[in-house]
Amino acid sequence: MGDPVIRTASPYTNPIIKCPRLQRLSSGPSSSFINNNNSNNNNNKSSNMFNHDHVNKTNLHPGGVKPHVEHTELEEELHQKAHIDYDRVAIIANPSVASLYEDALVYETGTAITSSGALTAYSGKKTGRSPSDKRIVKEPSSENDIWWGPVNKPMSPEVWKINRERAVDYLNTRNRIYVVDGYAGWDEKYRIRVRVVCARAYHALFMRNMLIRPPREELEHFHPDYTIYNAGSFPANRYTEGMSSSTSVAINFAEKEMVILGTEYAGEMKKGIFTVMFYEGPVKHNILTLHSSANEGKDGDVTLFFGLSGTGKTTLSADPNRRLIGDDEHCWSDRGVFNIEGGCYAKTIGLSAEKEPDIFNAIRYGSVLENVVFNPETREVDYGDATLTENTRCAYPIEYIPNAKIPCLSPNHPKNIILLTCDARGVLPPISKLDSAQTMFHFISGYTSKMAGTEDGILEPQATFSSCFAQPFLALHPMRYAKMLAEKIENHNANAWLLNTGWVGAGFAQGGKRCPLKYTRAILDAIHSGELANVEYENYEVFNLQVPKSCPGVPSELLNPKTAWTAGANSFDTEVKKLGGLFLENFKKYESEATEDVIKAGPVV
């Protein structure tokens, strides 16, 4: 069964442009009748009749509206560049939040308004990213820079054309498509203009939240640097050369376009732009793109937090005494630090007002909840329910965070660089001070540990390594980013730290406990106050890390894993050497590009 009504945007948003009915009223027989009648009463009647028909007419009006007769600059551009059929498809450009709510509720299965006012949407079969289906077009302008391999698999220009044509063909079958224009990057010198062309209102609202929203006057003549064609509801042809499934997420740096087929997971658009910035930043502007959160103290001191999922990146950067620059994606340039995004994309599984009040309160009108379970009567969301996925999310404008710094940038260079890890073996110190080579080694390693599921019978934690804490999104070789980071740290005299939010006293398997959040926050406070830089340090063997002998607010016995260990000396030696070996094994694939001092900065087993 098709749509109950044809929905498109009204082409008569400009009051100066007369709609056909108004044109008939102002000329022709009807107009003569009105003009020849001098009765004020009759004039009022005709005026009231017009108002009744045209005031407050929304997209849900039974008569619907049709594509523009006189095409806009934006429509002409889409028609010329992508052959969007603007005579058949209504192009809804930069719609309001309210109209996107209406469209999502009427046309998209699984959408609803929750009790907090947020829109909830269902992303379909795919509830997370599809990294194995990511492709980069292999073409002359970028092929010598790209880090080819499992992360960036090549796609031929011919296959790109097939997939792009398939996406555009699908978009041309829709009654309406949405266009969202915005910026990636808060620094005007380095930002890129992004256009999203999609078929789902949920996707449009998501990217409206995640991109930086331009003033209305800047949208009138907006010309994108990069365009995303999201036809995620339509599959790729899995028999096309190089396709591994019916899902395809492809980026063409020469054409400055991205095409999505076979996945409706909105995060693919966000992370696609992130990959673009990982390429454009270093290659075009010599700026460093980072998978990090960032905040700023009252004196303007900036801290960057790197970390994989579950290490505390979002939690620790949310500090009542510091302003949030951003929670996920940043660039470090010669002009300071800036956020790439205009919004936040927070995990919501297990969310509560007590644990994360800022995120909880940001879930309101204008926000998009993704794949959550809610009570159909009360519309209250059960954030503990992972029936659809563990990866439940919410996208909201960064303005919804009370202590966000708007604009989201700082002219100051970072004073502290914090590499977060969650070591479930309990053998990494809660805090270590890193030198330049160690910073590069641990940045490239990107270590954390994930707890094994009980169903597979494995009791010990699983080591996870993600280069630069961002491996799925990298465009260039990790060493290129690591060298840039080391240079910037050296040039701006930044302090680098390895902060373990994982287990202390013993590992997870030996009955240890996770480091209390109050101690982790005390460590951060000592870093920000400068106290931790001035205490006495000792060398921690195997990993050769500099560990403080004391830290305000933290028991001294917890600072060195060897002295804190409660599960027997033999088990400690076994665990620390085992983890050291995993680090060395993982780093082998980067040794050909690494300098001798960086290789030697790893563990000595």
Swiss-Prot record:
Membrane-spanning segments: none
GO molecular function list: ATP binding; phosphoenolpyruvate carboxykinase (ATP) activity
EC number of the protein: 4.1.1.49
Keyword check for Ligase: no
GO annotations of cellular component type: cytosol
Stretches assigned to coiled coil: none
Binding site for ATP: 307-314
InterPro entries (alphabetical): PEP_carboxykinase_ATP, PEP_carboxykinase_C, PEP_carboxykinase_N, PEPCK_ATP_CS
Similarity-based family: Belongs to the phosphoenolpyruvate carboxykinase (ATP) family.
PANTHER family cross-referenced by the UniProt entry: PHOSPHOENOLPYRUVATE CARBOXYKINASE (ATP) (PTHR30031:SF0), PHOSPHOENOLPYRUVATE CARBOXYKINASE ATP (PTHR30031)
Protein name as it appears in the record: Phosphoenolpyruvate carboxykinase (ATP)
Organism in which the protein naturally occurs: Neurospora crassa (strain ATCC 24698 / 74-OR23-1A / CBS 708.71 / DSM 1257 / FGSC 987)
Organism ancestry: Eukaryota, Fungi, Dikarya, Ascomycota, Pezizomycotina
